[in-house]
C-alpha cells in the first residue's frame, strides 16, 4: 500500500495561493494612487497644470479628488458655522448680558407703602398707584396758613405767600444786637458771652451818686514830727511802723492803706538790729569828726605818732 503524504494536497495549495495574492492586491491597491501625488509633487507645476481644474475619479460613491488622501465626510467642515461653535457663542453672549430687570410674566409687583397690600402687573401701574400715596405739594382748598411769629395774626391762602411774609419777621441780619444795651456783635457766641455780663448788671442796683459837698473837707491832720535825737533807744527811727490811724474815707472809694501796718520789712529788721552790738547813736558823728581831723595836715598836740582815731 502506498503511504499518503501527511502534507497538504498541491491542488489545495494552488487554490490557496491565488486567494492570498488577491487579498494582497486589494490591500496594496489604495497605496498606488497615494504614491502618484508624491511623484507629481516633486515636479515643478507649470502654468497648464495650475489652470486645469481638479480631476475627480469616478470610482466610489461620491468620488475622490485626485492627489488627496481620503477623508471621512464627518471631518469636512461645511460652508456655515458648525452647530457646536454656535452653541458656545450663544452661551457666552447670554452670560455677558446684564440680568433683566423686568419681572417675569405673571408676577405681581407689591406696593412698598406701609399699610398697602396692593400689587400690580407692571411698573407703570405701580408708579401711577404711588401718586395716590404721595400727592404733589399744593395748598388745600379752604385751608389757611397762619404766621407763627408772636403778636402776628396774618393768614395766607398758600404756603408761598406765608414764606414771603415770614421774611419780614426773620430777615437775615449781619449782626447780633443785645436787647438790653443795644450793643451789636458779629457772632452769636459773642452775644451769648455778653448776655451773662449784661444780665448781672441789670440785676444789681445802681450805686447812689455821692452827695454834693457844700464845703471843702477838712485837711487831714499830720502827725507831729519827732526829733530823731530824742529817741535814743531806736537806732533807725524811720524803719518804725506807722501807727497813726488812717483818715476816714470821705467818698465811695476805698482809702489808700499804708503797707507798713501789715508787718512787712520793718518788723523783720528790728530783732536783727537790736541783737547786733554796735556803737551808740552819736558814733557816726564822732567818726566823721575824727576822719576829718586825720585828713588834715596838722598833727595832734603832744607830737605822738599814734593814729588820730586811737583811744586815749
From Swiss-Prot:
A zinc finger (C2H2-type) spans 109-133, 145-169, 176-201. The keyword Iron-sulfur does not apply. Residues 84-93 have a biased composition (Polar residues). Transmembrane segments: none annotated. InterPro entries: ZN414, Znf-C2H2_ribbon, Znf_C2H2_type. It comes from the Eukaryota. This is Zinc finger protein 414. The gene is ZNF414.
Amino acid at each position: 500500500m502506498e503511504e499518503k503524504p501527511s502534507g497538504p494536497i498541491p491542488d489545495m495549495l494552488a487554490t490557496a495561493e491565488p486567494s492570498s495574492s488577491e487579498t494582497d492586491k486589494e490591500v496594496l491597491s489604495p497605496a498606488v494612487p497615494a504614491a502618484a501625488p508624491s511623484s507629481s509633487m516633486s515636479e515643478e507645476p507649470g502654468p497648464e497644470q495650475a489652470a486645469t481644474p481638479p480631476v475627480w475619479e469616478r470610482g466610489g460613491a461620491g468620488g475622490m479628488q485626485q492627489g488627496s488622501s481620503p477623508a471621512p465626510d464627518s471631518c469636512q467642515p461645511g460652508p456655515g458655522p458648525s452647530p457646536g461653535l454656535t452653541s458656545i457663542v450663544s452661551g457666552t453672549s447670554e452670560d455677558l448680558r446684564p440680568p433683566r430687570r423686568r419681572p417675569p410674566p405673571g408676577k405681581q409687583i407689591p406696593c412698598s407703602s406701609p399699610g398697602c397690600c396692593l400689587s400690580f402687573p407692571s411698573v407703570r401701574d405701580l408708579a401711577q398707584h404711588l401718586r395716590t400715596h404721595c400727592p404733589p405739594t399744593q395748598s388745600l382748598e379752604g385751608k389757611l396758613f397762619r404766621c407763627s411769629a408772636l403778636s402776628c395774626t396774618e393768614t395766607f391762602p398758600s404756603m408761598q405767600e406765608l414764606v414771603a411774609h415770614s421774611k419780614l419777621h426773620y430777615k437775615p441780619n449781619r449782626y447780633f444786637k443785645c436787647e438790653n444795651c443795644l450793643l451789636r456783635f458779629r457772632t452769636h457766641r459773642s452775644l451769648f458771652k455778653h448776655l451773662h455780663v449784661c444780665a448781672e448788671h441789670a440785676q444789681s442796683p445802681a450805686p447812689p451818686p455821692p452827695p454834693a459837698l457844700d464845703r471843702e473837707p477838712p485837711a487831714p491832720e499830720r502827725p507831729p514830727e519827732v526829733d530823731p535825737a530824742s529817741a535814743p533807744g531806736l537806732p533807725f527811727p524811720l524803719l518804725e511802723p506807722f501807727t497813726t490811724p488812717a483818715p476816714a474815707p470821705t467818698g465811695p472809694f476805698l482809702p489808700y492803706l499804708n503797707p507798713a501796718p501789715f508787718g512787712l520789712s520793718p518788723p523783720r529788721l528790728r530783732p536783727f538790729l537790736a541783737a547786733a552790738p554796735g556803737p551808740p547813736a552819736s558814733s557816726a558823728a564822732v567818726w566823721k569828726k575824727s576822719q576829718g581831723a586825720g585828713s588834715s595836715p596838722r598833727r595832734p598836740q603832744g607830737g605822738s605818732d599814734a593814729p588820730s582815731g586811737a583811744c586815749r
